[in-house]
């Protein structure tokens, strides 16, 4: 072999190795070893803070304080696990435990969730005496600062180059004729995550009753309580565990813990299978713990179920559904409540053909979330109360989180219709400094005020928030009287709006096909 051929072979091998390394680590701005070392340091601090907090776990006589401490311990545990995922992904980018296969997107999501968890921990002490909060505030502040320093070590999301082609504007929550939607039969070459079985792909669209266990109030199922069925599910399952919940009103608070992966819940329909609770802030619960249904395990799927909180408007924060589940889907479900109905706390989530009702901040949290073809209905609340549909909680400019509401119907629920002239309803308000929400091609009724958006407190966040509107229609979609804030944007073309599509915002093309749910991956279909 000539020296030249030998040199070329070595060069090609070097390029292959170099390309592989770049593929694995080009999402980081620092060497993987340095990134992992920083994570390990933070995990040690988390353990120290947890040790301090655990001393107050049995604090008696103050329900709200007990719940706040319990929340913090859970949230710190969440953060520790999310950091562990991030470290593992950097050491083994092709590992089976990774989320979507896009390691950069996965890592940004998990680090963002860890950051939000600490803020939620502190918020839980609102309304308490402050003694415990003051004892742990310093440690929590240190932890929060360390997590904020970790996020910029991950490269920001690359801007999409492709622009979707224009098409007809959707006229409501149903797809118009000719609208092209993604289906799992479209492209058999789609790469599914390792944990997806072939028969899982159409699970949510199937009309059959294929399930592992069933729940029925009349005793005809395996269990009469939903929580008993959840306990039956294996921990960290790599395959779906399907629970069929028969029709009925289930009066229980349900919590799916972080270790319960890939649980699927199938009901008999909206307002047919109903999970109901009435916890509220006024009755001593933290907002986080007030949820009727809470899910943290990765890969959760729900179909044909209503989640409701019946506490009423006078009880203030009262969550119907809280999700911290990464890569979760809610299909043909309803979330019914008043203030803080749907808590999209953290992680990547997708809602399709759902009904969401409420009054104040009734879609809130710091998840990275897309809503498509949903009915979003404002209700009548307390006298002189203003309705706000969204209150997105992005706290740091490096977080990937935000809300993208698409192809949906924004209107008034039946109880509000007679009071449209006395109850003002807004698209949202900035709960946190970098609040981010966009509305894309929705039908907005006259329930939406001409100015569109509401301040949180004077000029707080008006120049740092990111609110956008693109090609909405209907009586409430007029732009001439919209707010003039520095952070408010009207998208005149698809360049900015493309950043908030399913394919870009939540990397849905990488994981939604595995669920079988229909979705629109662009702006024009």
From Swiss-Prot:
Any single GO BP term = pectin catabolic process
Task: List all annotated glycosylation positions.
Answer: 98, 222, 278, 409, 421, 443, 492, 499
Give the site residues for Transition state stabilizer: 339
* Active site residues per record: 340, 361
Region Pectinesterase 44, annotated ranges: 212-509
Region (Disordered) residue spans: 157-192
Which InterPro entries does the protein's record reference?
Answer: Invertase/methylesterase_inhib, Pectin_lyas_fold, Pectin_lyase_fold/virulence, Pectinesterase_Asp_AS, Pectinesterase_cat, Pectinesterase_inhib_dom
Q: Which reaction does it catalyse?
A: [(1->4)-alpha-D-galacturonosyl methyl ester](n) + n H2O = [(1->4)-alpha-D-galacturonosyl](n) + n methanol + n H(+)
Gene Ontology molecular function terms on file:
enzyme inhibitor activity; pectinesterase activity
The record's principal subcellular location, in a coarse class, is: secreted
The yes or no answer to whether the keyword Ligase is present is: no
Binding residues for substrate: 287, 317, 429, 431
Renumbered to this chain, the signal peptide range is 1-19
Functionally, this protein is described as follows: Acts in the modification of cell walls via demethylesterification of cell wall pectin.
Further details from the record: The PMEI region may act as an autoinhibitory domain and prevent untimely PME activity during transport.
Q: Which family does it belong to?
A: In the N-terminal section; belongs to the PMEI family.
Q: What name is this protein filed under?
A: Probable pectinesterase/pectinesterase inhibitor 44
């Amino acid at each position: 072999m000539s020296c030249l051929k030998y040199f070329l072979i070595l060069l090609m091998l070097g390029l292959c190795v170099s390309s592989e390394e770049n593929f694995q680590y080009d999402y980081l701005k620092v060497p993987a070893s340095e990134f992992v070392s920083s994570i390990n340091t933070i995990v040690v601090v988390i353990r120290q803070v947890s040790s301090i907090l655990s001393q107050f776990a049995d604090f008696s006589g103050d329900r709200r304080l007990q719940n706040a401490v319990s929340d913090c311990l859970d949230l710190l545990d969440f953060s520790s696990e999310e950091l562990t995922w991030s470290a593992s992904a950097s050491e083994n980018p092709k590992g089976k435990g990774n989320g979507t296969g896009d390691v950069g997107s996965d890592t940004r999501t998990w680090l963002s969730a860890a950051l939000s968890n600490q803020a939620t921990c502190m918020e839980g002490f609102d309304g308490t005496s402050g003694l415990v909060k003051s004892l742990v505030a310093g440690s929590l502040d240190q932890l929060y600062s360390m997590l904020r320093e970790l996020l910029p070590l991950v490269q920001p999301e690359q801007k999409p180059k492709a622009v979707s082609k224009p098409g007809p504007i959707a006229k409501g929550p149903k797809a118009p004729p000719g609208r092209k939607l993604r289906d799992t039969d479209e492209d058999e070459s789609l790469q599914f995550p390792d944990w997806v079985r072939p028969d899982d792909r159409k699970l949510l669209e199937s009309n059959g009753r294929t399930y592992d266990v069933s729940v029925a109030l009349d005793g005809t199922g395996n269990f009469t309580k939903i929580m008993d069925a959840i306990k039956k599910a294996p921990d960290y399952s790599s395959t779906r565990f399907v629970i069929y919940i028969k029709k009925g009103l289930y009066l229980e608070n349900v919590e799916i813990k972080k270790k319960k992966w890939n649980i699927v819940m199938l009901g008999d329909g909206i307002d047919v299978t109903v999970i109901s609770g009435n916890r509220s802030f006024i009755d001593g619960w933290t907002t986080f713990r007030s949820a009727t249904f809470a899910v943290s395990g990765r890969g959760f799927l729900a179909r044909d179920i209503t989640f409701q909180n019946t506490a009423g408007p006078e009880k203030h924060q009262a969550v119907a559904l809280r999700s911290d589940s990464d890569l979760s889907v809610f299909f043909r479900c309803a979330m019914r409540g008043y203030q803080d109905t749907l808590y999209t706390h953290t992680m990547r989530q997708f809602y399709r053909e759902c009904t969401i009702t409420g009054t104040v901040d009734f879609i809130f949290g710091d998840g990275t979330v897309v809503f498509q073809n949903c009915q979003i209905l404002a209700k009548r609340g307390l006298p002189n109360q203003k309705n706000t549909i969204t209150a997105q909680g992005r706290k740091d400019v490096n977080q990937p989180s935000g809300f993208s509401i698409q192809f949906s119907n924004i209107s008034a629920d039946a109880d509000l219709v007679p009071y449209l002239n006395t109850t003002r309803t807004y698209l949202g308000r900035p709960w946190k400094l970098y609040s981010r929400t966009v509305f894309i091609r929705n039908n907005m009724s006259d329930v939406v005020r001409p100015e569109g958006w509401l301040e949180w407190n004077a000029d707080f966040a008006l120049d740092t928030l990111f609110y956008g509107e693109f090609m909405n229609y209907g009586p409430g979609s007029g732009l001439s009287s919209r707010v003039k804030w520095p952070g408010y944007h009207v998208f005149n073309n698809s360049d900015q709006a493309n950043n908030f599509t399913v394919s870009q915002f939540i990397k849905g093309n990488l994981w939604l096909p595995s669920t079988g749910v229909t979705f629109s991956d662009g702006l024009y279909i």
